């Protein structure tokens, strides 16, 4: 999944994407609407703690949380991500879980 920390930063690959623009703890959904005001895209932010509690409430046990580092060979920009940003904050969170 996309790493929850990215919620606090603007989707910009350059230096402007390195400054916090909102609260990490703000769980207000991000909503894009069409001309009639209907939701056409929605993202629901949750913190790492929220996700860990979701895992436990679902009967799973968290074994590991993997936050892959930006690969040195990747010099591309994609959306709000670039080597500049990717070398400083994680873009992905992988929850490794088992059901006991």
What are these regions, as identified by a protein language model?
Residues 33-35, 76:
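Generic signal for short, ordered secondary-structure residues
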Residues 7, 72-74:
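Generic structural signal for helix capping and beta-alpha/helix-loop junctions
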Residues 1-33, 42:
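Conserved class I S-adenosyl-L-methionine
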Residues 58-60, 75-100:
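Core SAM-dependent methyltransferase catalytic element
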Residues 2, 67-68:
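Active-site beta-loop-alpha junctions enriched in small/polar residues
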Residues 23-33, 40-67:
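Short alpha-helix
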